[in-house]
Amino acid sequence: MIKENLFFEWVDKNNKKLKLKWKILILLLSLLLFIFSFYSLFQPINYGSTRIFTKNLKELFTFSNYSKKYPSWTLWQLSWYYMFLTIRYCALGTTLGFIFAFFTSFVSSNFQKYKFIRYIINIIIIFFKAFPISLFVYFFSIGFDKELAATLILFWFSWLWMHKYFLDFLNNLDKTNYKIMHMKTNENFASFRKTLFPYIVNKYFMFFVYSLESNIRWTTIINAAGVIGIGLLLNDARDFSLGWSVVGIPLLVILVTIIFFEFLTLFLNKVILNIKNINYQNTSFLWIKLNFRRIFKWFFVLFFVGLNIYSIIKISSFTLYPNYIKNFWNHFFSFQNEVFSHNKENNPFYWILILIYQCIVSITIIAIISLVFSILGNEKLNNVTQWIPLRFLNTLFRIIPTIIFIYLFSIFWIGTNIFLLVAVITALRKSTSLVKQLNESINSINWEIYKTLEIQGKSKFQRIIKFVFPSIKKDYLSFLLFYFENQVQTLILLGSVGGSLLGSKISIVGQAGERTENILELMTYSWISWVFIAIIQLLQFYFNLIVQNKKISQLYLIKNLNTYFTKIKVIFKNKFSSDQ
């Protein structure tokens, strides 16, 4: 029997479904909100810039090997020099972040018996993760020498973001064997290492490779903020005296490098880590294949150990600037009300409002594009001629640095803001990453049920609506929540190129210098960002509970708080009784 209330209907109370009329209403409201946000950000296009745009695009493909900015270098030499420099500090920063994230996620996961420690570590990480990335880009840039600063920025970013991935992964593991061994040994890490780690090491292996590839692409954004790396050569596109001809070779070097890592990831995932369909009768082949995997993984680990040692040796200077570091932390909790006014340009509520508009436009584009492309580009849902072109376009758009699209198209909005342009471009770029993740989710569904529906005569559209989408719905919503927070950070970070009003405020003050008044103003803007991002994290946490069909009251922390308050009441009651 179907039960219902005003909003939901259900047969099983743990599996409630929103009524169709409310779904339609939510979709209509979302559409209206998107249109209103888009209109609020819209700036007229300067079609007179079409000639300049065409000229820049043509120059991009001339691949000039000389730049008057670097007379002693050819651009091929300089591009590969900066590319190897970027790979070095990305490898070292990602490795350090990976190691830290592994241990902090383990200590703060369900494997940690001391729940107080779990909460303390998670609160610390959530606290720092809510700050805009640009704040710590500034901190490391003023406190450490160039290459060391770049390494620490990558470490910081990798640690905070990988911690969440690892924590979610660990908390969702089947712990049956672990619990049995833990009961015998009473050792957390040893039990984990012997019962679970051998089965999840491949997952961590791929986590590392994905993170390294992602960080190499991400460096072009922090390079726009002045951090050393290959992206500095892309910034020359903003210099009209140099032109776009000097950008072609650095861009090509970046694309070649990222394509190499794409193929490496594919090779590791499909060949090295995939051991299905081994013919056990052919013992010689079996030995070669199993040992090849083991040898390759050890070679990979040793190679990166060697690369990290080499990266440390090649860091040109380990110079620290203690006065700047001390000054930064001394004013970390500062907040200046006097920097604000009722003028829109200096009103923090207006900055946040613009950021909200950008996020609404972005997340709507991400939601639609990623879902459509993941379904149309899935190899199991479509034939080869359909999914290969879409997969190619998705990969091509994903490997081209975001900053190139912003520099190229911003010519149409000279003299006005580019908030809408940046929101759309970054949303399209993030859609390509989400397509990849959703494609993996689609490949993991129960395809026997899909085939049964096909035999029953259901159309392809019906099979997708009735089975495929419901099967990936939880993953889809969880991904969108994650990308919402990630998009806020990206928009603030791209303030260095005018990507957001709040980000521009942080960038301008950050580039002004290391004076105390600049740090005070920077911290004020950063705390505004912190409050906004922290609210998003709380909403993300709450909506994740809804997606997972959990109740707030089921959480351990809430239950224990209730227990503690009850105990305190009993203590006071007993004390009051004894006093009488």
From Swiss-Prot:
The chain crosses the membrane at residues 22-42, 83-103, 120-140, 150-170, 214-234, 247-267, 295-315, 349-369, 403-423, 464-484, 490-510, 527-547. Keywords: Cell membrane, Membrane, Repeat, Transmembrane, Transmembrane helix, Transport. InterPro entries: MetI-like (IPR000515), MetI-like_sf (IPR035906). Residues 83-265, 352-540 form the ABC transmembrane type-1 domain. One of its GO terms (biological process) is transmembrane transport. PROSITE patterns: ABC_TM1. It is a multi-pass membrane protein. It is found in: Cell membrane. One of its GO terms (cellular component) is plasma membrane. The keyword Transport applies. Probably part of a high-affinity transport system. Belongs to the binding-protein-dependent transport system permease family. This is ABC transport system permease protein p69. It comes from Mesomycoplasma hyorhinis.
